[in-house]
Amino acid sequence: MKQTKKSRLAKWAAAGFWLAVWQAAAMAVGQEVFLVSPVQALSTLLELLPQAEFWQRIGFSAGRILLGFGLGAVSSVVLAVAAGRWAWVEALLAPVMQLVKATPVASFIILALVWVSGSSLSVLISFLMVLPVLYGAVRTGIGSADVQLLEMAKVFRLPLGRRLRAIWLPAVLPAFRQGCSVALGICWKSGVAAEVIGLPDSSIGDALYRAKITLSTGELFAWTFVIILLSAVFEKLFLALLDRAVAHVLGEEGV
């Protein structure tokens, strides 16, 4: 308990330190067009909160980015299971996954604009960024399954459902959870970056671009804070729901 309290105090102290550095830097620069103070950024955010357009932009971007994440998560699990079952599938997918991981996000965004509209761009980019991360995580989990337990399950001819609960899910889910934690952050960053280039109306990326061209640095910082907050909140909510689902599936609920 004391350790947890000390850890929280340390985090708050670190946050306070960097806010003080930010405030000092803003005062040293002395021009809000280049760097606003944290107080001014917060003030701008509070001005945005009552506006219907603010929430409309959040709903638009969040819906598409999370759709891309969901599609990427489902596809990665299906492909990873297929790769674990058939070696030729893994051989086919290996160069594709490596290519997706190595290609800059900006290149994908520009190329994707040829194929899809600006409003769908963030879905596709989020999907592409999530896919190799979760594919690798699930493959790692599958590879860590206990070989002896698998042999025993084969000998005793355990049904698929029992094998999933007793062997495969305990091996895969920790790696999948860790992969989701990484992938959620990536999909938010890449999704908003896609919106900044694709400029779909009523999106967060469009708001960032407008703030940049009008030199509204306060809005730029306010929207950046919103993106960080949304990413953190959705990550915590998703991981909490995933943990509850895992506990239920593995029969650990209430333990």
Q: Where are the model-predicted features located?
A:
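Short cytoplasmic-facing helical segments at TM-TM junctions of multi-pass membrane proteins
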Residues: 137-176, 208
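Periplasmic/extracellular loop-to-transmembrane helix junction in inner-membrane transport proteins
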Residues: 28-70
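Transmembrane-helix boundary motif in ABC transporter permease subunits
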Residues: 67-97, 110
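Non-cytoplasmic
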Residues: 179-229
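Transmembrane alpha-helices
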Residues: 124-128, 160-194, 222
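N-terminal signal-anchor transmembrane alpha helix
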Residues: 6-29
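Generic hydrophobic transmembrane alpha-helix motif, especially the helices
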Residues: 98-133, 140
